[in-house]
Amino acid sequence: MYQVVLGKVSTLSAGQLPDALIAQAPQGVRRASWLAGRVLLSRALSPLPEMVYGEQGKPAFSAGAPLWFNLSHSGDTIALLLSDEGEVGCDIEVIRPRDNWRSLANAVFSLGEHAEMEAERPEQQLAAFWRIWTRKEAIVKQRGGSAWQIVSVDSTLPSALSVSQCQLDTLSLAVCTPTPFTLTPQTITKAL
């Protein structure tokens, strides 16, 4: 089973959480998205299992919970991918101009990924950049890696993992799962 839930950071970060969990929230710019992610998790699972953190900081449920999850946010949107199949990764990005997006693609995309982007019409290449970027990030996050490892991922190569993605208006969303899953707008739940 896979469950994908999208929500708004600005709304969810004010949601109800136990005081002990709120006390764990980081201060500064990450606080609102951290709280929003925990609210999404607590709405999906009650009670919320105890969490631990991997070497690269990836949150996970403690050993007793046979569930896996991953969170991602961009702008005011947050995504939760929940699984009972194994480790998962997700990435969401607002499709937006970025000053150095072509240079970044040259630096981190494989030849196959670069060819995929260049095959698009010029007006579609920015969306293709974000499509490839989210796919790479989802793979790295499924592995529990850090953003610095994105350059070592070639998302065009065959893999035992399943990667699926879709575009929702101005959002690019990708998921990486251990078993086949097709991400479509119909498979996504919107949090209130």
Curated annotation (Swiss-Prot):
Q: What is the recorded name of this protein?
A: 4'-phosphopantetheinyl transferase AcpT
List the gene name: acpT
* UniProt entry keywords in alphabetical sequence: Transferase
- Supply the NCBIfam families for this chain: PRK10351.1
An MF annotation (GO) of this entry: magnesium ion binding
Q: What is its EC number?
A: 2.7.8.7
A biological process term (GO) from this entry: lysine biosynthetic process via aminoadipic acid
Family annotation (SUPFAM superfamilies)? 4'-phosphopantetheinyl transferase
Catalyses: apo-[ACP] + CoA = holo-[ACP] + adenosine 3',5'-bisphosphate + H(+)
Q: What does this protein do?
A: May be involved in an alternative pathway for phosphopantetheinyl transfer and holo-ACP synthesis. The native apo-protein substrate is unknown.
- Report the GO terms under cellular component: cytosol
Task: State if Transferase is listed as a keyword.
Answer: yes
